[in-house]
């Protein structure tokens, strides 16, 4: 089988590349089979599904994340369980901030934007309220865990 299409950082492809992580891949497969993010959870808590473009390949990448929502805006917390490095999806969203967000059976286009300062502090409190382990994750790493807002793209 040959691949006649090559992709650079600025090109995109509709090819979906599953995660190398077993649990991520299995959760994505379950969500896609059921058409509903409520078919899976992380530690008993609800998730949303982000579909984005890979930074290096431009291919579609999918990741389930903890559901943190306030007034129709969602947050994505790049905690990676308090690991010393950021998750790959964070680099993907910085490079290609447009994404599709799925919550339950609904999905829509959104744009990711990293937040800092007072805005981050306000959202960080919401994130910790939604998933208290985030506070512990922050104490386990020297990096400031990034928070990105996933703001809906208005139609029109």
Language-model segments: residues:
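Extreme N-terminal tail/first-helix region
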Residues: 1-43
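Accessory terminal regions of nucleic-acid processing enzymes
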Residues: 3, 150, 156
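Short, structured beta-strand-loop surface elements
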Residues: 13, 79-134, 140-147, 152
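Short secondary-structure boundary/capping segments
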Residues: 39-40, 66, 91
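Short coil/turn segments at secondary-structure boundaries
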Residues: 42-45, 138-142
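Short beta-strand segments
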Residues: 44-79
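Short strand-connecting beta-turns/loops that link adjacent beta-strands
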Residues: 70-72, 106, 155
């Amino acid at each position: 089988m040959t691949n006649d299409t090559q992709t650079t950082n600025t090109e995109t492809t509709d090819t979906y590349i599953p995660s190398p992580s077993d649990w991520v891949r299995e959760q994505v497969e379950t969500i896609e089979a059921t058409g509903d993010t409520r078919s899976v959870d992380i530690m008993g808590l609800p998730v949303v599904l982000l579909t984005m473009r890979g930074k290096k390949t431009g291919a579609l990448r999918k990741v389930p994340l903890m559901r943190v929502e306030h007034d129709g805006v969602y947050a994505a917390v790049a905690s990676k369980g308090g690991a010393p490095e950021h998750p790959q999806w964070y680099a993907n969203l910085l490079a290609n901030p447009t994404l599709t967000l799925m919550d339950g059976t609904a999905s829509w286009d959104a744009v990711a934007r990293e937040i800092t300062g007072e805005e981050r502090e306000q959202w960080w409190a919401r994130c910790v309220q939604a998933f208290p382990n985030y506070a512990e994750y922050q104490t386990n790493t020297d990096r400031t865990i990034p928070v990105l807002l996933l703001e809906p793209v208005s139609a029109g």
